[in-house]
């Protein structure tokens, strides 16, 4: 990818999307951001981006967008992503994550073949389902466990099928559980930090033994840019993590930072329906392109915890 390339980002006011856009703008790239401005949109970063000369904002819903501006790459982040919400309102996840992806693929397909951009689908490790031992590879069967992961798996399949049927160039990036600055406080780290700071206990599903792999949003940004620049087209890349933590270990780390006694730091609640025991991926394919995980979780965690701010959001 050249610095002169034009990148369309969908969902660029969301968590990973805003990290990706900030990096692209810092490197002098032209970015066009398509975003619905949902409840989780970062309004502070929206104002920040609008001051940038190489940035354009299109307030639109990916399900209804009817025109794709000129571009060289589409990076498709836009999605509903909170599992609890998918359990209570699965239809919204199906329409946004599946129909929204289909519509974006159709907009690419309608371009003249010489003008069709690369389509990069940002997926999730959750499409594989859980794994008690070992690691999932890109060839592993997709066995999603909840409406969110099922909708993302369906979207991935659409991307592959549009590639085979219509000849679109595509890549799929499947990152591990992301963390970083200014994530909307519905996910484990920001929600738990926000509650503890306000003198309320965090909420822990079950006994906290469920294991997640943690990857910083900046490392995910590196992964996506690496795939765009060096990846083999029509190929899936896992972006995994060397760090696996039980949920209770994450809560313990947050409590230490905020100096909250563990007996006051969290309360156990009934397990989420369809809870996955462990996620883990083999990312040797991505590492062969030169990518590596560079952020250290415990070194990054304190400023993230201290910076949680619900007033940034829509």
Please provide the spans of the model-predicted regions:
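Active-site loop immediately N-terminal to the catalytic Tyr-X3-Lys motif
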Residues: 90, 173, 185-186, 231
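Residues in well-ordered alpha-helical elements
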Residues: 84, 91, 102, 182, ...
């Amino acid at each position: 990818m050249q610095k002169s390339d034009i990148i369309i980002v969908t969902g660029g006011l969301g968590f990973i999307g805003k990290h990706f856009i900030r990096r692209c703008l810092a490197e002098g790239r032209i970015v066009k951001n398509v975003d619905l401005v949902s409840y989780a949109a970062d309004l502070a970063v929206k104002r920040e981006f609008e001051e940038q000369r190489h940035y354009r904002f299109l307030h639109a819903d990916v399900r209804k967008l009817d025109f794709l501006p000129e571009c060289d790459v589409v990076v498709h982040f836009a999605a509903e992503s909170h599992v609890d919400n998918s359990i209570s309102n699965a239809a919204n996840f199906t329409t946004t994550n599946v129909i929204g992806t289909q519509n974006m693929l159709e907009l690419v397909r309608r371009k003249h073949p010489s003008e069709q951009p690369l389509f990069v689908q940002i997926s999730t490790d959750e499409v594989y389902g859980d794994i008690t031992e070992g690691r999932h590879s890109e060839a592993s069967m997709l066995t999603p466990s909840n409406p969110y992961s099922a909708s993302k798996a369906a979207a991935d399949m659409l991307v592959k099928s549009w590639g085979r049927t219509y000849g679109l160039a595509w890549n799929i990036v499947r990152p591990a559980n992301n963390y970083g600055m200014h994530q909307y406080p519905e996910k484990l780290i920001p929600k738990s930090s926000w509650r503890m700071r306000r003198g309320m206990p965090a909420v822990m599903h079950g006994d906290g033994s469920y294991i997640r792999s943690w990857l910083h949003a900046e490392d995910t940004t590196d992964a996506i840019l690496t795939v765009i620049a060096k990846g083999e087209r029509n190929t899936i890349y896992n972006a995994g993590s060397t760090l696996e933590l039980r949920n209770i270990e994450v809560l313990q780390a947050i409590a230490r930072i905020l100096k909250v006694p563990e007996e006051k730091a969290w309360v156990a609640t009934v397990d989420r329906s369809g809870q996955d025991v462990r996620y883990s991926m083999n990312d040797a394919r991505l590492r062969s392109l030169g990518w590596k995980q560079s952020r250290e979780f415990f070194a990054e965690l304190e400023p993230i915890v201290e910076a949680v701010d619900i007033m940034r959001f829509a």
